[in-house]
């Protein structure tokens, strides 16, 4: 586990050059925030105390899709129970809900989404700082694995966003989008992004001084995406709309090589590894706390 003492993690950045390894220091003097994105926070709940030296922010996805769509995701009501426990432990300002991705099928209609969103919003009222919505992009891999999915058209996106904003106001949950149609701002959504300077300052209570040279990963994205220490082809949820996993066989092979004692997510050190230090620095303004 991670404690107040510095730890190191290693990541093979390029599958075509697997000998290239990046070393990250997991230490409070260079890591301002640990950001988690998950559909199931429960396995981490008993170990949160090990992260007490770090600021945290959690995005937890809760959608209405059943096991045919998300076969490895726990029952949604269990997930919501974990979100409430997480919020109670670290504070609602450090927890956000993702309703993502939004798509249409014969089962999951516009009306279905409206009813489901309200049920979840009712459960999470007072437990989260905001909700991020996003609409499914039909990548070729997604079309192949999930042929019945339909993208949400522009007018339906605007209708759903307006309704989600209305429901969100009712339950005290602002709606945000990230890299979606900028016109959704007219529907009442905050389109500035999900992991922005403002969001992280509110969560941590500290001013962040971001270098001007810091660039977004995608055009139109203002999120502070730092060092991603996760990997593709390691998630066992098996969601049919996923574009990050190649196939079940690759995931199973990777999981087989996971060693909890290793500083790599998958595998360990190999002969010939070329280890490069990640460029890391704190952006916290030590002189200024916001509140």
Predicted feature residues:
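Short Fe-S-cluster ligation motifs
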Residues: 248, 252-291
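Flexible, acidic/Gly-rich N-terminal and inter-domain linker regions that tether
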Residues: 147-208, 256-258
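Non-catalytic, usually N-terminal nucleic-acid engagement modules in DNA/RNA processing proteins
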Residues: 21-22, 26, 31-40
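Conserved radical SAM core fold
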Residues: 41-43, 58-72, 99-106, 138-141
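N-terminal [4Fe-4S]-dependent radical SAM core
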Residues: 27, 188-232, 255, 274-286
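Conserved C-terminal portion of the radical SAM core fold
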Residues: 78-144, 162-179
